[in-house]
Amino acid sequence: MKAIRVGLLGLGTVGSGVVKIIQDHQDKLMHQVGCPVTIKKVLVKDLEKKREVDLPKEVLTTEVYDVIDDPDVDVVIEVIGGVEQTKQYLVDALRSKKHVVTANKDLMAVYGSELLAEAKENGCDIYFEASVAGGIPILRTLEEGLSSDRITKMMGIVNGTTNFILTKMIKEKSPYEEVLKEAQDLGFAEADPTSDVEGLDAARKMAILARLGFSMNVDLEDVKVKGISQITDEDISFSKRLGYTMKLIGIAQRDGSKIEVSVQPTLLPDHHPLSAVHNEFNAVYVYGEAVGETMFYGPGAGSMPTATSVVSDLVAVMKNMRLGVTGNSFVGPQYEKNMKSPSDIYAQQFLRIHVKDEVGSFSKITSVFSERGVSFEKILQLPIKGHDELAEIVIVTHHTSEADFSDILQNLNDLEVVQEVKSTYRVEGNGWS
């Protein structure tokens, strides 16, 4: 029976994992799709480098188009990263009638819609399960398992680096900079951690999730982003005192025809399932009108978890090839994109304020909120050590719009009794959904 022949772009951590799974699981793959899988060509940087996997020398090449233009290659698997140049490689592969599997979240967040259209036009499949949450099969779940439902909300911990940092800050009461260095030493954070800690990595993944979950062409620029680098020990301490856990949460929510997508530090009730996701693990919480609340949990990165998702996509492509139904791996968007304005986005808010500790300060602050019709769910007022003339007020509001909350912050900063608004965070998950 004719083998399916794979061309692999990249033989790093994930690429080596892909080769290992294909080599070690031949019997399983044969049983799944009824034909063997062979690795025909592999792009590498250095032909002489010692590798963790055993491949014949004639399979290796340093020229990308040796893989893409090889007439014997049926499926191109891309694990080299990059955006602009890599996009062209995949477009050329699709135009050469080769199916594509990619783990590239950066590429799919920016050019996903274009690549899906290119695949359909050429009668080819493109799969990208590994681009979001590594070993968690969340994209296929949205596209297939929950395809009959209407998804109204997704909340995700989709960046392992920031979850590791926040877990350590909470459990060990360690400052941000100290935990970041530990994460770098352990290999969880890059030497330049900006993409992770400022929320950009998570934003790319949320754009992909929202695109599939809401069937709209959601782009990276549609995602509002705030990272974790400004979170302080005091923020962590006060949130715990009020019964919340700080997480970097990607939020995608639909109300009627409008959606919002954001990534930001968020306070969740301690009893919320996402609050129990620790260290480098990922999880995605999904709410559907029919299914209700579901959550998907697992490793968000790493060689073998990510490679497992890549090879699972390869199996999906192979099955489609055997059945003659390629070119329809993903359905196009059903709806026109319609993003919420700040006046449409409602949430509870947490804020810490340093104020003058004098008669009338609190009433002046509460009047700012009451003018906007915003009430309080929780309030703390405490002295500030070493500053007898000041007090700290911590407030959790009831639901208010982003537009009203922005005006409230401006009016608070204009008050003579307010020394500084120290921090603000969104609060989610009271009642879970």
From Swiss-Prot:
L-homoserine binds at residues 190, 201. Residues 350-426 form the ACT domain. GO terms for molecular function: homoserine dehydrogenase activity; metal ion binding; NAD+ binding; NADP binding. PROSITE patterns: ACT, HOMOSER_DHGENASE. It catalyses: L-homoserine + NADP(+) = L-aspartate 4-semialdehyde + NADPH + H(+). The keyword Cell inner membrane does not apply. Catalyzes the conversion of L-aspartate-beta-semialdehyde (L-Asa) to L-homoserine (L-Hse), the third step in the biosynthesis of threonine and methionine from aspartate. Utilizes NADPH but not NADH as coenzyme. This is Homoserine dehydrogenase. It comes from Bacillus subtilis (strain 168).
